[in-house]
């Protein structure tokens, strides 16, 4: 059901101090972030109040921390297991996403057996 323009403005996130920008992700240098196991490689764009990233996890990657930050995460390639500290686990394949608020009741962390490539905005 379509929402009115006014309804979209009320419900949307305020992205501020981010001028129109085109990003060639292949030209963005990757930074290396070791996990508890494996490695994450981040290509990051930051402006204003947002951070957008292409993140590639090596096979066997397990995050070294439980995360409380809110994200919109979209799986571009591979398969990702998102573990919640409360014991729940969700498997996401290419074309799937999750959304989580800042300081959610159950922090999350990432694991992948085969490797994964993600697009994340936070």
Predicted regions and their residues:
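Conserved short histidine dyad/triad with adjacent acidic residue
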Residues: 48-67, 101-104
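Short acidic-glycine-tyrosine-enriched beta hairpin
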Residues: 86-103
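A short hydrophobic beta-strand segment most commonly corresponding to one strand
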Residues: 99-100, 113-122
